[in-house]
Curated annotation (Swiss-Prot):
UniProt-recorded name of the protein: Small ribosomal subunit protein uS2
SUPFAM superfamilies (alphabetical): Ribosomal protein S2
GO CC list: small ribosomal subunit
Any single Pfam family the record assigns to this protein: Ribosomal_S2
NCBIfam families attached to this UniProt entry: rpsB_bact (TIGR01011)
Keywords associated with the record: Ribonucleoprotein, Ribosomal protein
Organism: Carsonella ruddii (strain PV)
Molecular function terms from GO: structural constituent of ribosome
Family per similarity comment: Belongs to the universal ribosomal protein uS2 family.
UniProt-listed CDD domains: RPS2
InterPro entries attached to this UniProt entry: Ribosomal_uS2, Ribosomal_uS2_bac/mit/plastid, Ribosomal_uS2_flav_dom_sf
Top-level taxonomy: Bacteria, Pseudomonadati, Pseudomonadota, Gammaproteobacteria, Oceanospirillales
A biological-process GO annotation: translation
């Protein structure tokens, strides 16, 4: 990780100082023009700490679940998680998905059956259109779970404010949570805090690339 790359990015620029969450205060080094500025050293330490845990997960051949339900992050999380063959949710989160693994497994099996039906010539055009609609709906909601056979070891959440339900489910199951947190976020429930400008796609890309470099 080269410091110059971080300095040249906007990764260290936090939100307005009046919105500072006390739990994130230890990651702030000073303010400029009323903006909180993250300590680059602490960003690096936080990222490397999570990278060490991710290495352990890969070594044990366990899974990491990516969450990117917020429009701002959706495309990035979708493409990145697929590129490293990890499960993801980039649309609506179905409550209980973590606590009831059998439900999404059933939906993935249903998706496979529907795709087989679409290939059969014996079905009418109307029936095939109906199958295609069902296929699309299931794919959007459950397609990202395809690579998830059991409870993930880590969940990386792009926006904890949008996905509070997932945070609560993960805590009940004692699943580790990592998240990209700005200076206004509450980090009290997060195991691996990634302090950064989470309003910047570039910041998230930089961190993800560092975390998974030489692992995939």
């Amino acid at each position: 990780m080269k410091i110059i790359h971080l300095i040249n990015s906007d990764i260290f620029i936090g939100n307005n100082k009046k919105f500072l969450n006390f739990s994130m205060k230890k990651y702030i080094i000073f303010t400029i023009n009323n903006l909180n500025i993250f300590d680059l050293k602490k960003i690096i330490i936080s990222v490397l700490l999570l990278k060490k845990y991710i290495k352990f997960i890969y070594k044990k051949k366990m899974k990491i679940l990516f969450i990117g339900t917020k429009n701002f992050f959706r495309e990035l999380i979708y493409k990145f998680s697929r590129s490293i063959r990890q499960p993801f949710v980039c649309n609506k989160w179905i409550s209980g998905s973590l606590t009831n693994l059998q439900n999404y497994k059933k939906m993935i099996n249903k998706l496979k059956i529907i795709r087989k039906k679409i290939k059969f010539k014996s079905y009418t055009k109307k029936e095939k259109i109906s199958f295609l609609k069902k296929e699309k709906k299931i794919e959007i909601l459950f397609g990202g779970f395809r690579n998830l056979k059991k409870t993930p070891k880590l969940i990386i959440i792009s926006d904890i404010n949008k996905d509070k339900i997932i945070v609560n489910e993960a805590k009940r199951l004692k699943i580790k949570i990592a998240s990209f947190l700005d200076s206004s976020d509450n980090c009290s429930k997060i195991d691996f805090i990634l302090p950064c400008n989470n309003n910047s796609i570039n910041s998230i890309k930089i961190i993800l690339n560092i975390l998974f470099k030489n692992l995939c």
